[in-house]
Each structure stands twice: as C-alpha cells, then as structure tokens.
Design a protein with these regions (language model features):
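Short acidic-glycine motifs
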Residues: 1-502
Length: 502
C-alpha cells in the first residue's frame, strides 16, 4: 500500500463582507474611482449607450437575488485575511490525499514434466482526495473528493510441452476497471435550499465569478466501467536451424463511460452587466459580484444526456522464424496481422458519418427562398448527420479495415566474444481509440440572457435571471429522431466511417 500527502496551499479571492451586502463604495481599481451601473437603465444618448450609476455604488436590497444572497451567506467562505480585498482567503492546510492498495495472488501447479499451469488474481484500489479551490470538506468544493479507481482481474496460463521440439502456451485473462469521481460532501446537499426550483438533482450548480474563486461542481461526476477479456495462443516449433513461432490473440473490450456535462447547471458571472457602457471594456466600472447579486449571469447552461455502452473486438495473428544462418549470424523474419473491429454502441447512440449524397429535408425551402438564384449551392442542398443502426445505416462506427499486415525483420551478428550488433525493421499499426460523437444524444440548454451589448430590448434582461434561468425547462436530447435535420444551423462533427488505421 501507499499513503501520500501532498501540500497544496492556496490563496485566493472571496467576496468581502461589504460586497456581500451590495456595498461597492470602497472598491478601487488601480487606485482610481470605481463605479457599478444599473443594467436596467441602459439607453442611448448622443449615439452612445449609457447607464445610470447605482447611488453611492450600493445595490438596493430589493434588487438583490435571493439565491445569490444565500450563496454568499451560506456557501462562499468569508475572508480570513484582514484588511485585504484581493487575496483575502488562504487555506494553508489544503492537501492532496492519495491512498493506494494493491494485492496480488498467484498459484502454480505442475501436473507433470510436460504440463504446468498458473493462475493470478490481482486487485488494486486508489482513492484521490484533492481540492482545486481549497474548499475541501464543504459543498463548495471543486476537484476530486474523492476520485476512486478500482482495477481487478485474473490470468490463467497453461504450458504444455508436446514434444522435445514443440511447446504450446494458452492464456486467458480478464480485467475490470471502475472509476468514479463523486463529491461526497456535495451529495449531502439539496440545491433547492438555495432557492432553485427547476434544476434537477441535488448537486450544487457550478458558479464562476470573474476574478474570484469558483465554487460547485455542476454535475454528478464521472462513472466509468471498462471490461477487457482476452485470449492468447502461442506455439513454438524447433527444427534444424529454425525456431518457428505461431500465435494469435483475441480481445473483447467494453467501455461504459458516463459523462453528462453540467447536468446541475453552470453559471458564469462577469462585469458585463454592471459596466458603464456595455460596448466598452473599461477598467473602472463593472463588478462580477455586483452582477451576481443582481442575478444576471453572462452565460450559463444545463446539460442532459446519456451514457455510452461501447464494445469492439481486437484480433491478431503472427508467424515468426528465428533462422540461424551461421554460427555468428541469426535472422528474424516475421509477419503480423492486426484487425481492430469496428466499435458499436449497445443502443446505437452514435453518429456514423455524413450523408453527402442525400437531399436535405430543407432542399425545397432553400431552393425557393428569396435570393436563391444567386446561390449555386442552394439549387441542390444535400447533407445531414447519419446515425448508427437507423435507416439501413450500419451499426458500427467505422468500416472494417482488414489489410493491416506488418512485416518484421531483424538481424543479430556476433562480431566477437564480447560484441553483438543488432538491427531490425518493423511496420506497426496504431489503435484508433475513437469513440465517435454522440450528437443528438447529449444536449446543452443555453441560458438566454438580455442583450449583453445594450441594444434595444435590454430592459427585458430581468425576464431570465438566476431565479428562473431556463423558463422553458431543460431540453431533452432528441437522439436520432431529427434525422438529417439534427443540429441544423449549428456546428457539427463526425468521423469518416472509411477511415484508415494509421
């Protein structure tokens, strides 16, 4: 076992007592005056956008977000370094905790001079406790608390001497890897106690305040389960000057990662909504804590999605001849064939390429749209995402690539009783390790804020606030139901199903 403790002392910024009360009268930038402005007063004067300053740089209590106030009173730690607005919170005892245990057991049995077996069982367990923001032990913590990795499996091996010149070796193995990253303290927390009503789950939303320490995790963490089963067979035959080796290998790999993004919500607050001019980046106005107290995030989102349940097979065959040409010269000749089977997903939650040759469902509308005559590409609009196992599309992510032959050659020459020169050449193919995009099966609902640039309509900024960030609810992943119209008008990604193994 291993026990390791690594110090991670942190000094960061947290809102001051005055800022938590909406009082920014003592805030200065570069020694000069500083002001916060009311975003609901945005108007045009003399061709420029202007806002009215909050009197005395204080936000009225009636304008403050109840959720933001609860965050600042119940979640954000108070400063512990006096008389400082910046670098006013220190955690000198913040440390990473790493615990690792490993067990290995092996049993050998010899049946006879020509047959023997062994079996091995192994297991290891690792816990990592590490805080990224120095708030370990609280619901505001970010980081691994804990991140747990478990790995266990076994091997069975049989060696049989078939004759004085022939040996057969068979081996089977299985490995299971589990990884979780859940915040134990956050699991005890109910986000509804802060005033949230629409957000699913109990995990605290992730909140970023520009120039301040960030809090919360925004999701229920990561949960991954990977299983690998394998079988190998090797046969060695010696005759004359030759040592021939034949063999093969088969693996079945199953990977089940669960990552759903910010399923409890992510909110980012900047100076934008409390600046003097929304179109101007000046250093003497606007404050992220002021924007937070007003309940106006610059951007936010909430995610929803499903896990993966992927599987693929790997096979290989090889032959090798160690030929002793002379007493001093040995030549190794070999050939290996690898086949990485196409990846599939248990419920076909994969994008499989792009329909370059299929007419878009929007083709008629685009062809008849005003100005289409000046758009050559509009005359015959094609394309859209294709989904595994839908509409006759193959379930696999890639087409099979079965021509991965790899020649090998090596030389060993004995120059003297103390010197041997060796050289060789080999061609190798790399595993792709591609899981493919899940467009349509994961979706992020964006926060629709007021007009950040201060154009007409800015007074409607108060409609969507911290209290009601997603009035239409969280979007539901459509899966493959939209067909070629999936993510239309947005950026998309896909893997070429005819890709070549590098």
């Amino acid at each position: 076992g291993l026990r390791e403790r690594v110090p991670f002392p942190q000094t960061t910024n947290v809102p001051t007592v005055a800022e938590r009360a909406g009082d920014f009268s003592q805030v200065y930038r570069d020694g000069g005056p500083f002001a916060i402005f009311d975003p609901l007063t945005t108007r045009t004067e003399g061709g420029r956008l202007v806002r009215t300053e909050f009197p005395n740089n204080r936000i009225p209590a009636g304008r403050m977000s109840p959720i933001a106030q609860k965050y600042l009173s119940e979640v954000y730690p108070l400063p512990n370094i006096a008389n400082q607005r910046q670098s006013n919170f220190a955690n000198t005892v913040n440390k990473g905790i790493y615990n690792y245990n490993a067990e290995v057991a092996r049993l050998d049995h010899i049946f006879s001079a020509s047959n023997k077996i062994f079996g091995t069982f192994f297991r290891n367990h690792r816990d990592e406790f590490r805080s990224n923001n120095g708030l370990q032990g609280t619901v505001a913590n970010q980081g691994q608390w804990p991140q747990t990795r478990n790995n266990h499996g076994g091997i069975f091996d049989w060696v049989s001497t078939l004759s004085p010149s022939a040996v057969l070796n068979l081996r089977a193995g299985f490995t299971r890897f589990l990884e979780t990253n859940f915040q134990t303290d956050v699991q005890k927390f109910d986000a509804k106690t802060l005033g949230f009503r629409q957000l699913p789950g109990s995990y605290m939303p992730r909140v970023n305040l520009d120039q301040y320490t960030n809090i919360g995790v925004g999701s229920q963490g990561v949960n991954t389960v990977d299983n690998t089963g394998s079988f190998q067979a090797n046969y060695t035959k010696t005759f004359s000057r030759h040592t021939l080796k034949y063999g093969g290998e088969y693996r079945n790999i199953r990977s089940n990662p669960r990552t759903t993004g910010n399923e409890s919500g992510f909110f980012n607050f900047t100076r934008a909504y409390t600046r003097r001019d929304p179109n101007s980046q000046d250093a003497t106005s606007g404050h992220s804590v002021a924007s937070f107290l007003l309940g106006y995030p610059a951007d936010a989102n909430i995610g929803a999605g499903q896990a993966r349940a992927t599987q693929w097979n790997y096979s290989a065959l090889f032959v090798q001849d160690d030929l002793r040409l002379t007493r001093k010269l040995t030549v190794n000749l070999g050939l290996r064939w690898d086949f990485e089977g196409p990846l599939t997903e248990r419920y076909n939650r994969l994008v499989r390429g792009f329909a370059f040759d299929q007419a878009s469902p929007l083709a008629d509308r685009v062809r008849n749209a005003p100005g289409a005559a000046n758009c050559p590409a509009c005359a015959n609009l094609k394309g859209g995402l294709l989904f595994a196992g839908v509409g006759g599309v193959d379930r696999s992510l890639f087409d099979p690539d079965r021509n991965n032959f790899q020649p090998r050659i090596g030389l060993a020459y004995q120059l003297s009783s103390k010197t041997v020169v060796r050289g060789g050449y080999g061609l190798y193919y790399s595993p792709t390790g591609q899981f493919g995009p899940q467009t349509g099966f994961f979706i992020s609902t964006p926060y629709i804020a007021g007009d950040l640039q201060g154009r007409p309509g800015i007074p409607e900024i108060g409609v969507n606030t911290f209290e009601n960030p997603f009035p239409s609810g969280r979007a539901v992943p459509p899966g493959a139901s939209a067909g070629l119209l999936t993510e239309v008008g947005r950026g998309i990604s896909f893997d070429d199903p005819k890709r070549i193994v590098p």
